Amino acid sequence: MRTKFIGSVLVCVLMLNSCTRDISAPEYPDVPLTANFAKGADVSWMTEMEASGLKFYNNSGTAQDLLQILKDKGINSIRLRTWVNPVSGWSNTEDMVKKAVRAKTMGFRIMLDIHYSDVWADPAVQTKPAAWAAQPFVTLKTTVFNYTVSVMNALKDKGITPEWVQVGNETNDGMLWPDGKASVNMKNYAELVQSGYTAVKSVSTTSKVIVHLSNGYDNTLFRWMFDGLKANGANWDVIGMSLYPVAATWQSLDKQCLSNMNDMVARYDKEVMLCEVGMPAAEPEASRAFLTDIIMKTNSVSKGLGVFYWEPEAYNDWQGYKLGAFDVTGKPTVAMDAFLVK
């Protein structure tokens, strides 16, 4: 995710210079979403933002619990990241569990996003937790298993069973570098995925394990990764994707993403999901058009499970992130209305 903080400024520049913006969503027939379609939001910044004094407001301007605002916008699922030992403490296991309890109490389904790092893990950076840095690979696999079990049990102790669990975040080139760098040693990465998969299932056989890559439009990347995992004996239940277009590109990227989703289902017989999406908060109408389209496209896939917006609550230039879906006053933009579809 860290790369998106830097990229969000560039995104806005590109959008301002685009002469081919399209903010109109295609018309869709009145077809309901499939049963249990996940309309989700990653709100991992929630507790940190609240602690900083920021408040969230509904469209009437009344201060409200963020989760209630999202629920009223049609969100039914919450995604939460967890880091191993972050310096700040935010997004550690304890903080994640607190948010999960709040979400579960309000009836949300839960996705757990395990980064296997003390900091952001994304396509550019997959740094081992400091405490794991010197471990030989055999020990590292055991540590991944034990840590995953501990996080799952922390939720289980609160009566929470996550419906989905990501084993790694945006692992385009594997995780826990250098040992698990897929372009160098796909077998090692597959074994790390398998350690996480086995750990999740040892605590909850019903939780679906996700392997998550960015650039959901890039079929070449996805075939390379999942062919490699399959050839090396790794198991997974769901293929997760990220998609962050701009106003000038969302229609073409949505089409490519749909093609990729259908190919993943046909090629691997696995479910697919958009685990992260976002567009600049400054372009709410374009964002609503994009979200409406990608929700309906995902719904059209035979094994399409849902769409999650990444940190929609980010506003007031929170940590420099500009791809949220709340305005400068802390209210949801019209982009979030896309999730009201039933």
Where are these regions (language model features)?
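Bacterial Sec-dependent N-terminal signal peptides
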Residues: R2, M15-L33
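Bacterial N-terminal signal peptides
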Residues: G7-N17
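N-terminal substrate-binding region of glycoside hydrolase catalytic domains
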Residues: D30-R109, H115-V144, S150, Q166
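Acidic (Asp/Glu)-rich catalytic clusters
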Residues: P32-A35, D65-G74, K98-R109, N153-I160, ...
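Hydrophobic faces of well-ordered beta-strands that scaffold small-molecule active sites
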Residues: A38-V43, I78-L80, I110-I114, E163-V167, ...
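Active-site beta-loop-alpha junctions enriched in small/polar residues
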Residues: V43-M46, W83-N85, H115-V119, V167-N172, ...
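Aromatic-rich peripheral "rim/lid" segments of glycoside hydrolase catalytic domains that contact
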Residues: A51-K55, D263-D269, A281-K297, V301-K342
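Active-site cleft segment of glycoside hydrolase catalytic domains centered on the general acid/base Glu
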Residues: N92-V97, V101, D122-G228, N232-W236, ...
